[in-house]
């Protein structure tokens, strides 16, 4: 086995091999799991899709952000190529990860519009800084207008934004 093949297999096995087998037996339906593309960013779109399909997963959660699988500056050219590569392997691309935290960001509308046109339904937003001095309610208030503007853009583009709480040590 080549080193590259071993690394692909090991990366996928770490997160995919055991997930869902008990649930699939219990309900008789195989869950459709999407693989977050970050661990395999060094692969091109075709190799990524082939690897994820070989692992038995149902889709790809693409990173569409600076230094991601798709760079925001090239989203109109590259995201359709990435999605097509996935579809050729029978995979879905219904979700993506971005660095978007504001509707005013230079590539926000282009990324969201292109993603929706490619069939992406939801995206994970970038992270907001928690302010210890403001606390939870104050931090929410601080970001309320920014999130409202992003919600308006999401509706315009036909996509749903999701936020992940992510603690930084």
How would you describe each model-predicted region?
Residues 1-2:
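N-terminal secretory signal peptides
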Residues 5-25:
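N-terminal export signals
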Residues 10-16, 47-50, 66, 92, ...:
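Active-site acidic/histidine proton-transfer and metal-coordination neighborhood
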Residues 20-43, 47-51:
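C-terminal segment of N-terminal export signals and the immediately downstream linker at the start
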Residues 28-33, 56-58, 87-94, 119-121, ...:
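Short, well-ordered coil/turn segments that N-cap beta-strands
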Residues 33-43, 97-105, 137:
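Active-site mouth loops of central-metabolism enzymes
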Residues 63-81:
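Glycine-rich, proline-tolerant flexible connector loops at the mouths of alpha/beta enzymes
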Residues 79-95, 150-154:
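Alpha-helix-loop-beta-strand connector modules within alpha/beta enzyme cores
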């Amino acid at each position: 086995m080549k080193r590259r093949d071993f690394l692909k297999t090991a990366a996928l096995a770490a997160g995919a091999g055991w997930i869902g087998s008990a649930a699939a037996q219990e309900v008789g339906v195989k869950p459709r799991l999407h693989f977050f593309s970050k661990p395999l960013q060094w692969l091109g779109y075709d190799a990524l899709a082939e690897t994820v399909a070989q692992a038995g997963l149902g889709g790809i959660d693409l990173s569409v952000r600076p230094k991601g699988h798709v760079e925001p500056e090239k989203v109109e050219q590259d995201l359709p190529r990435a999605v097509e590569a996935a579809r050729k392997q029978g995979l879905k691309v219904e979700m993506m990860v971005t660095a978007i935290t504001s509707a005013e960001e230079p590539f926000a509308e282009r990324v969201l519009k292109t993603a929706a046109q490619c069939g992406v339904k939801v995206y994970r937003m970038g992270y907001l800084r928690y302010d210890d001095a403001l606390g939870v309610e104050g931090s929410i208030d601080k970001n309320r207008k920014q999130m409202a503007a992003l919600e308006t853009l999401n509706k315009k583009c036909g996509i749903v934004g999701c936020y992940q709480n992510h603690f930084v040590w």
